[in-house]
Amino acid sequence: MRKFCTVAFLLATAYTAVAQQGIGVFDAATNVGNPAIQGKVQYNAQTQEYTMQGAGSNMWFNNDQFQFLYKKIKGDFIISATVRFLGEGVNPHRKIGIIARDQLTANSRYADACVHGDDLTSLQYRPIDDANTEQVTLSVFHPNHIELERRGDTFYFSAAVHGEHYKTVSKVLPLNEEVYAGLFICSHEEKVVEKAVFSNVRVIIPAPRNFTPYREYIGSHIEVMDVQTGLRTIVHSAANSLQAPNWTKDNQLLYNSEGLLYKFNLANGAIQKVNTGFANQNNNDHVLSFDGKQIGISHHAGEKRTSTLYTLPIAGSDQPKQVTRDTGHSWLHGFSPDGKKLVFTGWRKNQYDIWTIDIATGKETQLTNTPTLDDSPEYSPDGKWIYFNSVRTGTMKLWRMRADGSNEEQVTFDEYNDWFPHFSPDGKWIVYLSYPKDIDPTDHPWYKKVYIRLMPAAGGVPKTIAYVYGGQGTINVPSWSPDSKRIAFVSNSKL
């Protein structure tokens, strides 16, 4: 039986009091070290934010006092959050962050991702019970986004100012297999209470290190993010693989799961299977026409399981219309703005290039011709350009060309491997996915730490807007809201 959780059913109670067990995704809150003033936590289920209040003399030397919102976790994990203090504060050494401890005692071994009120950002740790705290400093000042990861006996602290990429430090520290892990706040003053807000909180149980891609899967969260504010909310979760949401004109999310397409209603959380007839082996390359009336799908057809393109009405159909023939894999990425063509990555002439096909006549037109991989093509809303990603320089970067294939030019230039450029409906922005440089540039694997990035369509410096555990299936297809204010995507965790 699959486990499902939809945020629509949680909105009846907007706030959770500290006395309650089960606060958001955490088990409980407690005051470690018996601070003179007891802390508390409020959880806003609508925004999925935690407001923490806490006192405490310090988290240093051999004794800690702080407010702790935790859950017990075994093995590897990643906890991430967007953090901010409320108010100017009293002591510049007030601190907030993410922590993992053996015990709830004041002298327990621990490792944390700690942000101070001043410029200090550090991975703090106590190597044995009763020992003095030590630290590894991180050269990020006043970060907004933080992450604590456990991988075996090594803890990694990553942090970034909004818009930038993570910087990371690490420490080998063999804590218990099961730890208390979560969020903390300490005022550094016994008689002072400080406040902080933790948003975009994710508790991630990653895929096993030896998992088999495309055979073994972990759970999925469908998320919606306000591009301007950066606030992310999980709208639907499942223990199986959900992939690649599109955003329909009537505010539903169209996504793939196990070869089928489903619509998720953002207003009420209802899920409806889309009728695709015989096409029941669809991959995650599905798109909507610009007018929102048609769906394009990529179905693995025949004995060869060739990825083949079809179109059907947005309401579904028993008989999707076949567009490409059995001439090699075709991976769909978009309609032309006039709805007359599809643009796709095609295996033709023993290589993958960018092609278009006339839906009415079936005539294919080759637009790129390189021995290296060109992929993920998408029309600009005005129809003048096609953006895509190419590994022709040795790194997967964004490129663009005229709609007829002329004037190819590179668009992004940094060290990351960039995939899946998607235009906002108003034509002003491009959002895309970036893998770190140690990932094979020809691959977009599952279950990696990736960035969702944003750049002006007119050109400019990209900025990171989301720090995500995902990759394949996260944002393969266009997922902007019709008003160009939000995007949908998939993140992953074992659920």
Where are these regions (language model features)?
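Extracellular glycan-recognition regions
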Residues: 20-211
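Sequence signature of WD/YWTD-type beta-propeller architectures
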Residues: 207-495
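Composition- and surface-driven signal marking solvent-exposed, interaction-prone regions
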Residues: 4, 158-163, 424, 492
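Bacterial Sec-dependent N-terminal signal peptides
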Residues: 1-21
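Assembly/interface hotspot detector across virion components, adhesins/toxins, and nucleic-acid enzymes
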Residues: 3, 41, 148, 254, ...
